């Protein structure tokens, strides 16, 4: 019996008490079930009686005694004790507790999934860095966290759409084009342009793809020429430079294990008239006005610190206008909730996006999530790593992966809460020792895989055998304290997934896996699984082997949620 199943059993007990007239309360949809800190308090505890007492106009202990009497009659419940002011301390029968291992092995990759958000469509946008340079270290964090969050959302029952918003319109594209053009001429980048060896690399590729560009360069007459040839050369450098940079970004993220459902071009919104359509709709809603030759959105009505311009006085749309059009575009595609993962320098966007949501008639608390993450720094041996050889004045995802590999990079970027600054010690996260969290978790999976291979070599049945009978294993024998601890930890995965999705906190998966790995290692050190020497396998051998297989399944499922591999050997 998993914690979720026990919670359902408690809800059923409340429902039965209400139906019988013993309680007069609204039956809750769900109740809290927790693992007590002290093993002597049972396998699980619930404060449900304290939560219902006020509405029932009864003392909490009275409510607890009513529910305890019903729970004691439930199959799989061995003992229920009312403790303190009205807590329910529940101990499961051996077969019910051990049944968690059986359930996990039977469910396989699907174990841990929930349907708590079934039918809700969520759009998750992350990274969305300008296509004017390599993927930076900060963007690497959002790539790892965003991809893990999309996997957690899916596991919690959401219908997820992931997007990268390509900022391929506006001033930054013009500056990048000017930087590429300067590199082609062997000149320094403009003061407001882009630096780094990568600009020269992109320039060489632009020239290789456009042989006629040499003639334009010659005809333009130099950097100060503002004639037609100069404009043509700038246009080619901007267009092709952005396309080449975007192709590199896509390849880098794909190599990092991050794939998107949609790469949405800002330019496409302009070309399709989506910005004008958004303004028209906002005008109809009564939130648009004109002043000083510009068109404004009255966002202060919805908590923003100032109204925002949609169209400048020179007639050009603002970035904010494109943001509003993009919000509208997502909602019109049927997404119920829009989730934006942004960097620390975008904190001001929270109020703006909430105002956009409200101006379109949505409830920001229901339709919008804006998650702000903090920055990442690298160090090696206590010394800060500050410079990328290729990018110049910033560090890149490639720098990190080149130093430690994809698995260590992804895990290390995800395991800390995104709202805390992160300093990664390259030596520490590449080290193959137990004080390195990613190694510790992956090693637990590899250790169990080795155990299962050894079991098969001894002729013992494992879940890999087509004829394996999971129901034939006597899981009631799993009563050793270390076995009970491990079973309790394994049962937590569905709730960890649910909370990670609800709180938008994929780091909870990583921390859970680290605790689980430690619990397994303690079990393995205390409970011998395979027979030694001339010993014959017994029923406890089969039960412990099943428990080990269940642990391997949960470790693999959790690592998959983080986009990290589960190695068979290390």
Swiss-Prot record:
Monomer. HAMAP family: Arg_tRNA_synth. A motif ('HIGH' region) lies at residues 129-139. The gene is argS. PANTHER family: ARGININE--TRNA LIGASE, CYTOPLASMIC, ARGINYL-TRNA SYNTHETASE. Disulfide bonds: none annotated. One of its GO terms (cellular component) is cytoplasm. It comes from the Bacteria. It catalyses: tRNA(Arg) + L-arginine + ATP = L-arginyl-tRNA(Arg) + AMP + diphosphate. It is an enzyme of class 6 (ligase). It is found in: Cytoplasm. Its EC number is 6.1.1.19. Keywords: Aminoacyl-tRNA synthetase, ATP-binding, Cytoplasm, Ligase, Nucleotide-binding, Protein biosynthesis. GO terms for biological process: arginyl-tRNA aminoacylation. The keyword ATP-binding applies. This is Arginine--tRNA ligase. Belongs to the class-I aminoacyl-tRNA synthetase family. One of its GO terms (molecular function) is arginine-tRNA ligase activity.
């Amino acid at each position: 019996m998993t914690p979720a199943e026990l919670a359902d059993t408690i809800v059923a007990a409340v429902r039965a008490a209400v139906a019988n007239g013993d309680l007069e309360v609204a039956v809750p949809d769900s109740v809290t079930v927790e693992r007590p800190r002290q093993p002597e308090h049972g396998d699980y505890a619930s404060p449900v009686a304290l939560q219902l007492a006020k509405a029932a106009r009864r003392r909490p202990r009275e409510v607890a005694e009513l529910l305890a009497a019903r729970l004691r009659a439930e199959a799989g419940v061995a003992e229920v004790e009312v403790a303190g002011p009205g807590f329910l301390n529940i101990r499961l029968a051996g077969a019910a507790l051990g049944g968690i291992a059986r359930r996990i092995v039977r469910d396989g990759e699907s174990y841990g999934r929930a349907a708590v958000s079934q039918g809700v469509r969520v759009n998750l946008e992350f990274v969305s860095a300008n296509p004017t340079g390599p993927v930076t270290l900060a963007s690497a964090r959002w790539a790892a966290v965003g991809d893990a969050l999309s996997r957690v959302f899916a596991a919690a029952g959401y219908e997820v759409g992931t997007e990268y918003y390509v900022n391929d319109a506006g001033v930054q594209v013009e500056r990048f084009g000017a930087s590429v053009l300067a590199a082609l001429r062997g000149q320094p980048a403009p003061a407001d342009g882009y630096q780094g060896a990568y600009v020269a690399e992109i320039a060489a590729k632009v020239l290789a793809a456009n042989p006629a560009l040499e003639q334009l360069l010659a005809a333009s007459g130099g950097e100060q020429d503002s004639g037609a040839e100069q404009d043509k050369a700038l246009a080619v450098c901007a267009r092709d430079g952005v396309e080449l940079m975007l192709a590199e970004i896509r390849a880098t993220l794909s190599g990092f294990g991050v794939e998107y459902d949609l790469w949405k071009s800002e330019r496409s919104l302009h070309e399709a008239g989506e910005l004008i359509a958004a303004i028209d709709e906002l005008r109809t809603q009564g939130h648009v006005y004109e002043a000083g030759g510009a068109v404004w959105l009255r966002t202060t009505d919805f908590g923003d610190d100032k109204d925002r311009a949609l169209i400048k006085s020179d007639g050009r749309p603002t970035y904010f206008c494109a943001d509003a059009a993009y919000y509208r575009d997502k909602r019109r595609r049927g997404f119920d909730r829009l989730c934006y993962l942004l960097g620390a320098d975008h904190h001001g966007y929270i109020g703006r996006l909430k105002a956009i949501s409200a101006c379109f008639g949505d409830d920001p608390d229901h339709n919008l999530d804006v998650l702000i993450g903090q920055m990442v720094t690298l160090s090696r041996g206590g010394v800060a790593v500050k410079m990328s050889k290729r990018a110049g004045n910033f560090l890149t995802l490639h720098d990190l992966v080149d130093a430690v590999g994809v698995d260590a990079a992804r895990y290390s970027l995800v395991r800390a809460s995104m709202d805390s600054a992160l300093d990664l010690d390259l030596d520490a996260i590449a080290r193959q020792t137990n004080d390195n969290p990613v190694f510790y978790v992956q090693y637990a999976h590899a250790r169990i895989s080795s155990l299962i291979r050894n079991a098969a070599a001894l002729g013992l049945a494992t879940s890999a055998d087509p004829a394996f009978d999971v129901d034939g294993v006597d899981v009631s024998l799993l009563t050793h304290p270390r076995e009970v601890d491990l079973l309790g930890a394994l049962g937590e995965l569905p709730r960890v997934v649910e909370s990670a999705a609800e709180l938008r906190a994929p780091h909870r998966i990583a921390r859970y896996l680290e605790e689980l790995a430690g619990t397994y290692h303690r079990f393995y050190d205390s409970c011998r699984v395979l027979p030694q020497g001339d010993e014959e396998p017994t029923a406890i051998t089969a039960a412990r082997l099943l428990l080990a297989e269940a642990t391997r399944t949960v470790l693999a499922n959790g690592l998959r949620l983080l986009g990290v591999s589960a190695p068979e050997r290390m």
